[in-house]
Amino acid sequence: MTNQTVRGTKDLLFDEWYRFKYIQQIANRISSLYGFLPAQTPIFEYTEVFMKTLGDGSDIINKEMYTFYDKGGKSITLRPEFTAAIVRLLVEKKLQIPIKLFSTGPAFRYERPQKGRQRQFHQINFEVFGVENPKADIELISLAHHLLTEFNISKNVRLEINSLGDSETIAKYKEVLIPYFKKFQNDLSEDSQNRLTKNPLRILDSKDEKDKLIISDAPKISDYYTRESSDFFEQILNGLTALNIPCTVNSKLVRGLDYYCHTVFEFVIEDFGAQGAVFAGGRYDNLVSSVGGKYTPAIGFAGGIERIMELINYSMKGDRPICLVPIGREAEEHALTLANELRRNGLYVIYEYNGALKNRMKKASQANAKAALIFGNEELGSKTLKIKNMDTGEEKIIAYGNIMENIHQTLLV
């Protein structure tokens, strides 16, 4: 047991690590194109940070948080998501708004491990604070679509979107939704029965098959939009159409957290079944004020890196090395100096010291080297090196004095 990873965690090695870093690099680059600034919060916060923001009706609060008491008796929680911590950061640091923040890192939830879902997972997270205009929603959804295009998976993913309306809309909707579900209270799942008194909208998010039958005939929130809510949502749909981003209005989409209002959306792929969201987010205009900050309209979304890793066809094995093959003691000693020079000039260098030349060249090939630099006492005396292009098999003698230029000319690196 001691030599196994904890259930729901995963080691990242070799190809998986390169795929992981590739996703982060693209997210960093795209975030800059849209004017997002980097922000990083600790992986744990005071538990109160999440209790205040996520709502006592959420699965995260009730079932999934990793919470413990530190030696000072303070209740601490490993972050289960980013938004609560970013809101804490915004309020504590008194950041000037409007502002766009991008963050990435690990998060933790105690849930059943499955394809693309771990108990320790990594997210890319985008938040926009201080913009009430629906154009912020359109731009953020466009950014998410841009990322999927960069990952070359946009054709396999569909955008589902809904509006929860403003607080007046939600209040009117609850007045009809609660009586509807109460008629079927004994037939609802245990989770949905608990949600009926805490946050009945969350029942619409149930994946239970019996619940789905009841939900299918539930009243639609769109019938209770205020004029302002309806206009806001229509502007978003029109904006997405103008950007050629297809979407499907899903009137049952509410998202899993209690703080959302107006826009909620998910980019969904069937490969992950009932838990098929690759990116998900929405608007939360009242969240900052609920934790003691000023009223700050906001919208954000997050995506799980492990999920994206399951979908992309990225097989880069990192930079291909240049392999040094010294022959003889003097050449072996010189190889250290040569390797240092090449690395200082930005080249990835490995050594092959042991065995016959044929075996060492075989190992260089197995290491996917793009070239081998072969040298012994004779080459050291004439200040030359033999370079072999491992792809073409071509060999040539190059001058040591101009080594970087000669390597570039030979390999076009």
Curated annotation (Swiss-Prot):
Origin superkingdom: Bacteria
EC number of the protein: 6.1.1.21
GO molecular function: ATP binding; histidine-tRNA ligase activity
InterPro entries: aa-tRNA-synth_II (IPR006195), aa-tRNA-synth_II/BPL/LPL (IPR045864), Anticodon-bd (IPR004154), Anticodon-bd_dom_sf (IPR036621), His-tRNA-ligase (IPR015807), HisRS-like_core (IPR041715), HisRS/HisZ (IPR004516)
GO cellular component annotations of the record: cytoplasm
Predominant cellular place of this UniProt entry's protein: cytoplasm
Catalytic activities: tRNA(His) + L-histidine + ATP = L-histidyl-tRNA(His) + AMP + diphosphate + H(+)
Localization: Cytoplasm
Cystine pairings recorded for this chain: none
PROSITE patterns: AA_TRNA_LIGASE_II
Zinc-finger among keywords: no
Signal peptide: none
A Gene Ontology biological process term: histidyl-tRNA aminoacylation
Keyword vocabulary terms for this entry: Aminoacyl-tRNA synthetase, ATP-binding, Cytoplasm, Ligase, Nucleotide-binding, Protein biosynthesis
Subunit structure of this chain's protein: Homodimer.
Protein name: Histidine--tRNA ligase
Organism: Wolbachia sp. subsp. Brugia malayi (strain TRS)
